Amino acid sequence: MVDLSKDLQFFKVFLPEFGSHELVIPPAFIDMLEKPLPKEAFLVDEIGRLWCVETKTEDTEERFCVFFTKGWQSFANDQSLEFGDFLVFSYDGDSRFSVTIFANDGCKKDVGVVSTTDRSRVSLDEEEPDDIFTKPDRMRDCDCGQSINRKRKRDSVNEDPHVLVDDKPEYVSTYKTKPEHSEKTQRTVNRAGDTCDISWFPEKKHNGFEESVYKPKHPHFVRNITRGSLQKLELPLTFLRSNGIELEEDIELCDESGKKWPLKILNHDRGFKFSHESWLCFCKSHEMILTNKCLFEFIVPSNGRCSEILVRIVSGRLPTTMTKNNYQVIDMQP
């Protein structure tokens, strides 16, 4: 299991007068780092949405500071940050910051549906690099450096970040709003009719993605595996509502081999999540690591009540896109 105690974390209280356009990273946090921050970093909220931000170093006789600059204002606007909001940043040691936001009443803010203000908000098929996750760290338990020198801290922004960018057009796809996509894929996917038969069919290699791409025939979304999602896997309410899905309290996860894992659907402050212990055991059994992605495909009968979810674990990159309802799906473009 990922050792959460090793997280590099800091917090900030949002003050619009000082933090609307850029955000100062605490110098004490910079002192903890074993390597410089990249020139471009990624902020990810609790349901897996990403924003690209630039970092800037100010090194003068008066002070030494590192900022989030370009892209931060979009993140603040999209998250509707208000005076006194409490933000916790968890850094993966590479280029990714997971952000948890608490309102001034002490409770987590409802992430809700955001409306992006510019292209600094990214979907995985557009600007996510291969190496924005931590090095693979195997799960071992189902229940769940030294400081750099001053010179290195002064060079804390790497001038040559290795960021891969795929220039792909924006594409919005959901199962119900784009039925023609499912018609194209039903001829090639799951031919045996077995709901547990999740197959991949070869396609031409494109834009660095895996050569074989699975085309789901059922409503689905894609989730990055992060430290947060290993502990708590939330189901996007926008996904469930846009596809007219009602979840049974007791469901089964069906993996690629056809093995089924029973678990419960629980209510939480923003909707629904998988029961903690059962989800952790599923993760451990499949040796999930932080570079994985999970494709969740919902088997929905005519009554709209779902009790089975197909799960495919992917280690490489996927051609995904962000829907207008702000969850990731497989890009169905030919």
Swiss-Prot record:
**A single GO BP annotation from the record?**
regulation of DNA-templated transcription
Query: What is the source species?
Result: Arabidopsis thaliana (Mouse-ear cress)
- What is the recorded name of this protein? Putative B3 domain-containing protein At5g66980
An example molecular function term from Gene Ontology annotations: DNA binding
At the top level, the lineage of the source is Eukaryota
Q: Which InterPro entries does UniProt cross-reference here?
A: B3_DNA-bd, DNA-bd_pseudobarrel_sf, Plant_B3_domain
Instruction: Give UniProt keywords alphabetically.
Output: DNA-binding, Nucleus, Repeat, Transcription, Transcription regulation
Organism phylogeny = Eukaryota, Viridiplantae, Streptophyta, Embryophyta, Tracheophyta
Q: Signal sequence: where?
A: none
